[in-house]
């Protein structure tokens, strides 16, 4: 037996370690490999390049509102395929697929709760649900959010992330633009603040209605915001668009939005703005999240 064969005979094969799926992810911008749990703790913001990745509607609302204060509104509303619409796939099949993938019934989630102890109503889009498209249920839930804000005499916050109106619902989806805008007029009559937070992307019928009707329109960094997409505009005007066209930084230079706020700073910034608008005390950034039980410092044993 040669020395190589003797070495091979003493080698014990080991089982290849398997890494569960979803433990790691890659930044869409810089390509950095990131630990999924750490990225979630960082609110889906890349710690290397500060790229703001898309966030689920529920995670966004849970990161905004005080813990233990959240109550969901309009969860009983479900979309119906009234037109029996079909393109390459039946609309009802698209709905079933999106509901299974996201766990949501439709693209908008609405909750009421408190923000640093201040009552608010908040809505957030689930972009993974058919591109966050606006149909009749999205419009109905948004109106429900407005009605709840009027009933509670409190502010309304909406986080938009949408490709626009849902083509499978045709005119019924376009009608939601007028419906939601009319509902917001009641907020204005009452003198209650409505803050619109524009995230990547906010396009089409959503940007042409309630997303741009905020008393304050805030955007996340580098969010794509507009009506038609940049490629469509380039093909229409037959000109090369400026670098960064329709991004938050471009829009704030043109006065189309009021400010850009990083996601980790969004919660305190919204609370500070609303406190001023509602003539309430400024929030204490050091205060613990409402509903979180902070353990007391244990008594020290007296020294002998």
UniProtKB/Swiss-Prot annotation:
Composition skew (Pro residues), residue ranges:
295-304
Per the entry, what this protein does is: Component of the acetyl coenzyme A carboxylase (ACC) complex. Biotin carboxylase (BC) catalyzes the carboxylation of biotin on its carrier protein (BCCP) and then the CO(2) group is transferred by the transcarboxylase to acetyl-CoA to form malonyl-CoA.
Q: Which reaction does it catalyse?
A: N(6)-carboxybiotinyl-L-lysyl-[protein] + acetyl-CoA = N(6)-biotinyl-L-lysyl-[protein] + malonyl-CoA
Q: What is this protein called?
A: Acetyl-coenzyme A carboxylase carboxyl transferase subunit beta
GO molecular function terms noted in the UniProt entry: acetyl-CoA carboxylase activity; ATP binding; carboxyl- or carbamoyltransferase activity; zinc ion binding
Give the EC number: 2.1.3.15
- Per the record, the major location class is cytoplasm
BP term (GO), one: fatty acid biosynthetic process
Keyword Nucleotide-binding, does the record have it?
Answer: yes
**Principal EC category:** transferase
Keyword hit for Nuclease = no
User: What range(s) does the CoA carboxyltransferase N-terminal domain occupy?
Assistant: 23-292
Residues involved in Zn(2+) binding = 27, 30, 46, 49
GO cellular component annotations of the record:
acetate CoA-transferase complex
The entry's localization annotation reads: Cytoplasm
UniProt family annotation: Belongs to the AccD/PCCB family.
Q: Which Pfam families match?
A: Carboxyl_trans (PF01039), Zn_ribbon_ACC (PF17848)
Q: How is the cofactor bound?
A: Binds 1 zinc ion per subunit.
Q: Which keywords does this Swiss-Prot/TrEMBL entry list? A: ATP-binding, Cytoplasm, Fatty acid biosynthesis, Fatty acid metabolism, Lipid biosynthesis, Lipid metabolism, Metal-binding, Nucleotide-binding, Transferase, Zinc, Zinc-finger
- What species is this protein from? Shigella boydii serotype 18 (strain CDC 3083-94 / BS512)
Enumerate the cofactors the protein uses.
Answer: Zn(2+)
The source's domain of life comes to Bacteria
Zinc fingers, C4-type, are found at 27-49
Q: Which InterPro entries does the protein's record reference?
A: AcCoA_carboxyl_beta, Acetyl_CoA_COase_Trfase_b_su, ClpP/crotonase-like_dom_sf, COA_CT_N, Znf-ACC
Pathway info = Lipid metabolism; malonyl-CoA biosynthesis; malonyl-CoA from acetyl-CoA: step 1/1
Region described as Disordered:
284-304
HAMAP family in alphabetical order: AcetylCoA_CT_beta (MF_01395)
């Amino acid at each position: 037996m040669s020395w190589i064969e003797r070495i091979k005979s003493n080698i014990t094969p080991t089982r290849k370690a398997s890494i569960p799926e979803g433990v790691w992810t890659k930044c869409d911008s810089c390509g950095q490999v990131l630990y999924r749990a750490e990225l979630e703790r960082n609110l889906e913001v890349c710690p290397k390049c500060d790229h703001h990745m898309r966030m689920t509607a529920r995670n966004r609302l849970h990161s905004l509102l005080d813990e233990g204060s959240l109550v969901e509104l309009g969860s009983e509303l479900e979309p119906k395929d009234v037109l029996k619409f079909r393109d390459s796939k039946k609309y009802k099949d698209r709905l079933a697929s999106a509901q299974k993938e996201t766990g949501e019934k439709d693209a908008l989630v609405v909750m009421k709760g408190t923000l640093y102890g201040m009552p608010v109503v908040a809505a957030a889009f689930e972009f993974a649900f058919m591109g966050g498209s606006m149909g009749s249920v999205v419009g109905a839930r948004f109106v429900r959010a407005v009605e709840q804000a009027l009933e509670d005499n409190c502010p309304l916050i909406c986080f938009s992330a949408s490709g626009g109106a849902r083509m499978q619902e045709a005119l019924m989806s376009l009608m939601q633009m007028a419906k939601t805008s009319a509902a917001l007029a009641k907020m204005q009559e009452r003198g209650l603040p409505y803050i619109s937070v524009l995230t990547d992307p906010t396009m089409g019928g959503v940007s042409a209605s309630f997303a741009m009707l905020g008393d304050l329109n805030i955007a996340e960094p580098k969010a794509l915001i507009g009506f038609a997409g940049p490629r469509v505009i380039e093909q229409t005007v037959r000109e090369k668009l400026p670098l960064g066209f329709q991004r938050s930084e471009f829009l704030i230079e043109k006065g189309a939005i009021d400010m850009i706020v990083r996601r980790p700073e969004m919660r305190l910034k919204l609370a500070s703005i609303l406190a001023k608008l509602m003539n309430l005390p400024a929030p204490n950034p050091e205060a613990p999240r409402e509903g979180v039980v902070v353990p007391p410092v244990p008594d020290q044993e007296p020294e002998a």
